[in-house]
Amino acid sequence: MAGNMLANYVQVYVMLPLDVVSVDNKFEKGDEIRAQLKKLTEAGVDGVMIDVWWGLVEGKGPKAYDWSAYKQVFDLVHEAGLKLQAIMSFHQCGGNVGDVVNIPIPQWVRDVGATDPDIFYTNRGGTRNIEYLTLGVDDQPLFHGRTAVQMYADYMASFRENMKKFLDAGTIVDIEVGLGPAGEMRYPSYPQSQGWVFPGIGEFICYDKYLEADFKAAAAKAGHPEWELPDDAGEYNDTPEKTQFFKDNGTYLTEKGKFFLSWYSNKLIKHGDKILDEANKVFLGCRVQLAIKISGIHWWYRVPNHAAELTAGYYNLDDRDGYRTIARMLTRHHASMNFTCAEMRDSEQSEEAKSAPEELVQQVLSAGWREGLHVACENALGRYDATAYNTILRNARPKGINKNGPPEHKLFGFTYLRLSNELLEGQNYATFQTFVEKMHANLGHDPSVDPVAPLERSKPEMPIEMILKAAQPKLEPFPFDKNTDLPVKDHTDVGDEVLVAPV
């Protein structure tokens, strides 16, 4: 029976603090992290996830990598007997929800922007976003002779070379490739650093000269040289109906609007495809899984225009699946999809935001599973309460436990945001331990579950037309039960109050 039940086991990881390595690339919290890892091990956790910041490791100059601090952290993780998910963090820390520290991208890269500010994502008003390089420079050799994609590939190759010990030992099991702000495959359409507040629709971010030239060339090729980038899509904190682009029968439904949205979302898919191809070459043969993260943009999901998703680059409408296209691209690289907001309930959201996190999770997970992917999840906000854990448990096994073998569907893993002393104290720790136990189908910790095979080479390039076939028809998501069949009991005695903590 235990053998059959093991197929229901979902691995649990915990995200390490953003500043586990200091802003001057030193590891100074050895005793604190060692003690915290011990408590995670005692709770039965499978592993941890860590941001490996580009701005720290290659901060001193082109190819002047310094991995020493990360090697010290990885040694502690290895000693604790935990697995490790490493994020190739090519973005800035600072400017997004939960960012408590500021780690910019390398100064020598930003210096290129002093003479060519178009290396950064730009909104229609001309404001630059320095969190991540625009995908418009993916193939532009502007960085001491290298393109952006070459810089990312070289960084990953140096990581593989320097972390060979941990790759060979099976400590590092997952390489999550950062593809945009907050490490997510999206445009920086809702930057808090520029005044965006929830539930603003965000803005299209494609007005740097490189993306603008690309759009003009694409429009001319399509026989419409007169088409320009949108000028009617509003500003960060607008509601959809305030804009000509997103209102009922707005621009987004016209030939011109559809052309723009296809171009905008396809550029993002090609960006991910290109960088994953490099990652696959670098980690070929390693026992690791490649992964990307998709942002959980749950606001304005319940209106036909899905405005906030569209500005982020997810061309998702009621009759078009904007996530299955991404999933199909991932199949080429044997990569997995990591999604967020796994803890959210619709009932916790404000009515004005037209938010539907539960339906969004259902759609995205179903899209990944239909394409045969491993799908993982995270929580968006720090929570310690049974309600949140039970929502995660429901999403981890949507139709519950199967005592005779694999469940109909299950998450490949779940990563909890984020490690803190608060998580490891008193009732919070006790509830978290119970949650881990339930994710493990009450079987206790088992490191042999879901072993990772050596990474195979990416399949031949997939034409964008084949990828886009996944968008329509938009199929109904797989059914999800309302509640989990292995719930965490609520011991918090706070009634219906939701405990929310900063991540």
From Swiss-Prot:
Keywords: Allergen, Carbohydrate metabolism, Glycosidase, Hydrolase, Polysaccharide degradation. Gene3D superfamilies: Glycosidases. One of its GO terms (biological process) is polysaccharide catabolic process. Its EC number is 3.2.1.2. InterPro entries: Glyco_hydro_14, Glyco_hydro_14_CS, Glyco_hydro_14B_pln, Glycoside_hydrolase_SF. Substrate binds at D51, H91, D99, K293, H298, T340, N379, A380, R418. GO terms for molecular function: beta-amylase activity. Optimum pH is 5. Highly active at acidic pH range 4-7. Retains over 80% of maximum activity at 4.0. At higher pH values the activity decreases markedly, with more than 50% of activity lost at pH 8.0. The active site is at E184 (proton donor), E378 (proton acceptor). It catalyses: Hydrolysis of (1->4)-alpha-D-glucosidic linkages in polysaccharides so as to remove successive maltose units from the non-reducing ends of the chains. PROSITE patterns: BETA_AMYLASE_1 (PS00506), BETA_AMYLASE_2 (PS00679). It is an enzyme of class 3 (hydrolase). Belongs to the glycosyl hydrolase 14 family. This is Beta-amylase Tri a 17. It comes from Triticum aestivum.
